[in-house]
Amino acid sequence: MPTLEPSVLDQLFHEARTHNVWLDNPVDDELLHTLYDTVKYGPTAANSTPARFVFVKSAAAKEQLVPCMSAGNQEKTRQAPVTVIVAYDTQFHEQLPKLFPHVDARSWYAGDQARINAAALMNSSLQGGYLVIAARALGLDCGPMGGFDADKVNATFFPDGQWKVNFICNLGYGDTSKVHPRNPRLTFEEACRVL
C-alpha cells in the first residue's frame, strides 16, 4: 500500500480542526450517502459493523435533538447543517450470518447482552472515528461531541431501545476564522511504549 501524500495527512489530521461555528452551506443527501458508503468499509471485529447513523438535518428533527444537548453544545448543534447521532445496534449480531458467513459468529453473542453491548460500543466507536476521517476526506468539517443526555437522546430517537447513542458529531463547512488555537498533544514518549 503506498504512503499518502503529506497534503492528504494534513487534511485528515495535521491541519484538521474540530469546528463549533458553521457556515450556512448545506450538505446534500448524496454526499451523506457517499460518506456512509466510505465508512462502511472500515474494519470491525468479525465485520460486525454495529454502528448506526442518524443524520439530523431538518429543523423539526433539530428541535428534538437540541434539548438533549448540554448547554454549551445546543447552539452549535442548531447551526450545523447536519448532526450525526452515532449509535450502535444492540442486536447487531443478528446480521452476522450475512456479514460474516463463513463461521457461526452469531452464536458468539446470542444470549449474552453484556458481551453484545461491549462489542457494539467498541466497534461503533471505531466506525465513528472512520466517519470523522471520511468526512474530512470528502471536504467536510466535523465537531464531535460527548456533552448530551444519552437517556434523553435514546428516548427521543430510539424509543424501542434497540439502538443506543454512542456520541454525536456535527458536520458541515466550518468557519475557520472562529477556531481556537490548537491545544497541545501528548508526545510519543508520553503516550507510547515500544516493547
UniProtKB/Swiss-Prot annotation:
Alphabetical UniProt keywords: Flavoprotein, FMN, NAD, NADP, Oxidoreductase
Lineage top rank: taxon: Bacteria
Cofactor dependence: FMN
GO MF annotation list: oxidoreductase activity
EC number annotated for this UniProt entry: 1.-.-.-
CDD domains the UniProt entry points to: RutE-like
Membership in a protein family: Belongs to the nitroreductase family. HadB/RutE subfamily.
Matching NCBIfam families: PRK05365.1
PANTHER family, per database record: MALONIC SEMIALDEHYDE REDUCTASE RUTE-RELATED
Name the UniProt record assigns to this protein: Putative NADH dehydrogenase/NAD(P)H nitroreductase RSc1004
Native organism: Ralstonia nicotianae (strain ATCC BAA-1114 / GMI1000)
Top-level taxonomy: Bacteria, Pseudomonadati, Pseudomonadota, Betaproteobacteria, Burkholderiales
